[in-house]
Amino acid sequence: MLPDLPIQQKYADVYKALVANQKSYERGLEDLKHSIDALLDKIKHTARMKSVGDLFADVDSRNEGGEISDVRGINITKRFMPTVADTNGVNLNTYKIVKKGQFAYSGMQTGRDECIRIALYDEEEPIIISPAYSVFEVKDKTIIPEYIMVWFLRAESDRRGWFMSDSSIRTNLDLVRFYEMKVPTPDMKLQKSIAEMYASYVTRGNISETLKKQLKDICPILIKGSLEEGLKHA
């Protein structure tokens, strides 16, 4: 039995308020993303361009003692993830170590996936990755790692990587070609602002997703509450 209209309206208003709150976060998220994209588009025409090879230094530190067992890979969203490869019986001593503030890169299948697989590691405890990956750290002290990561998160960077990938079946973006890619290098203050804006964008995105989940979870509760209140007034 449905509750009276005033009770229905009461619970509908609660739901509408929650939806409006989530939508406001979503709109703010879109506005912030547009601001970041516009700023990056501007600096690529005004800031000095440097090649990736001038910004990165190769790091080859191996898990020789076997102390680290946390094996990761990189997904197409440019984030570290637990490896999907079967490591049973694999000698992890040859795997490369990645520490906080370092990048991992794989040039494989860049063209096929239309994605440059690069990720910045931001956790305290080091991890290991396949020897097939490359590990970098920023050697140019005027460049902030987080800013470079934001640059490579752009769809335009992925399209450029696809264009520069080779003609093999796997359409790889080998290191030589990757090192030739250009990155605009504004002053550090602007780099920091861009990195902070993107961090805020990620935080707001997480909040928006949490609110969406809460909306799903609260619907049965609101319906139950309205029915119970309706019975009390029956």
Question: Model segments located where?
Answer:
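N-terminal alpha-helical segment
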Residues: 32, 81, 128-129, 144, ...
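Short, positively charged
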Residues: 146-168, 174
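Non-catalytic DNA-recognition/assembly elements of restriction-modification systems
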Residues: 4-65, 187-234
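Structured loop/turn residues at beta-strand edges in well-structured enzyme cores
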Residues: 50, 99, 176
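A short glycine-rich beta-alpha junction/loop motif
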Residues: 1-9, 126-132, 166-192
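Sequence-specific dsDNA recognition surfaces
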Residues: 53-103
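A short beta-sheet element
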Residues: 100, 104-153
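Short clusters of hydrophobic/aromatic residues that line enzyme substrate/ligand-binding pockets
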Residues: 72, 118, 161, 173
